[in-house]
From Swiss-Prot:
It comes from the Bacteria. This is Allantoinase. GO terms for cellular component: cytoplasm. Zn(2+) 2 binds at K146, H186, H242. The modification N6-carboxylysine is found at K146. Its cofactor is Zn(2+). Carboxylation allows a single lysine to coordinate two zinc ions. Pfam families: Amidohydro_1 (PF01979). One of its GO terms (biological process) is purine nucleobase catabolic process. Zn(2+) 1 binds at H59, H61, K146, D315.
Amino acid sequence: MSFDLIIKNGTVILENEARVVDIAVKGGKIAAIGQDLGDAKEVMDASGLVVSPGMVDAHTHISEPGRSHWEGYETGTRAAAKGGITTMIEMPLNQLPATVDRASIELKFDAAKGKLTIDAAQLGGLVSYNIDRLHELDEVGVVGFKCFVATCGDRGIDNDFRDVNDWQFFKGAQKLGELGQPVLVHCENALICDALGEEAKSEGRVTAHDYVASRPVFTEVEAIRRVLYLAKVAGCRLHICHISSPEGVEEVTRARQEGQDVTCESCPHYFVLDTDQFEEIGTLAKCSPPIRDLENQKGMWEKLFNGEIDCLVSDHSPCPPEMKAGNIMEAWGGIAGLQNCMDVMFDEAVQKRGMSLPMFGKLMATNAADIFGLQQKGRIAPGKDADFVFIQPNSSYVLTNDDLEYRHKVSPYVGRTIGARITKTILRGDVIYDIEQGFPVAPKGQFILKHQQ
């Protein structure tokens, strides 16, 4: 049998092992894994490289339509490809209108035409004003629904995203349980965080340490406990977004041990940055939940290695530079991290701390694909989409602004020495990024809809 592509001599991350083996691709799918696979139109030599499943980033904000001056499909998905991401799950907020019904998601599909370098699945929004329309998004094919129990959205814009109160969350979770859809939650206590923030600003406490103190760990833990119980009563599968504290992870672990259907994610910035670094970097490292102290970070690494965190995500949430101006308490909260999830975490988790390659593959790709039902993604296995990233270990570089593909070339990682490099990203058998050639093909990304897999 002749194949379209054979990748030879790489250390391939399989589900339960990593070994030097060849991969054959035909028609955009993985056709065979083994040795002496035969002939192919193209042969790639991956000697000395790690071949990982392409990252499935389950938490990405692309602000198009409506706020394309923040980030757009063209720049955002190119950055993703350069960073080894082959599939993103896009959040329903930051764009205008927010993705809360059939009409708004169709606008998003139109805005992305011809611009997707990678594949993209969609989340719908659960907001205060759309509980009677959740079924529309399910029918279109979203893979989950995101909501906030922390304050969010611009109250001066009618079609912006909105947080939910406990009653709205409960009613929405009941409906999503009936639809068989998971609810994803940003967990911070809205009233307490808002009050602590206002108190700090009124007293002139506007440093990074002050911001972190205004969103203490207990506000995350309380919100996690609350939504765990409400989702359990409502009969809805739950996913906790961007957990920032080991205490928060412990709540999820406890609920799982009691039989609840719950998963969780965290982000690289909670493992590689701390509050002192946040103070040095400034507003580019502001996010919520916030980047906490070094002791908290050590606890997060322990939870990650224990297998208590299901997946790692970027929570890429950029904005125009002027929204990052001024003091930390007033600046927009969101980190541009899409391009540096894979290389930073390979360096920090695998090279510096000894994480196994199969565990790395699960955290970056496999588990997210499983959680959100992306049946063709997340694994190097026969029959799956031929999505790969080539990683060059022990190859250090210093990240510069010019390296970034974002609309706004800023990131809290600029200036960081990263000890691994993404050298090639392959989507459904085609090279979409190469460290020497850049982006050699026209955008070929597709939207992944739940009911069309």
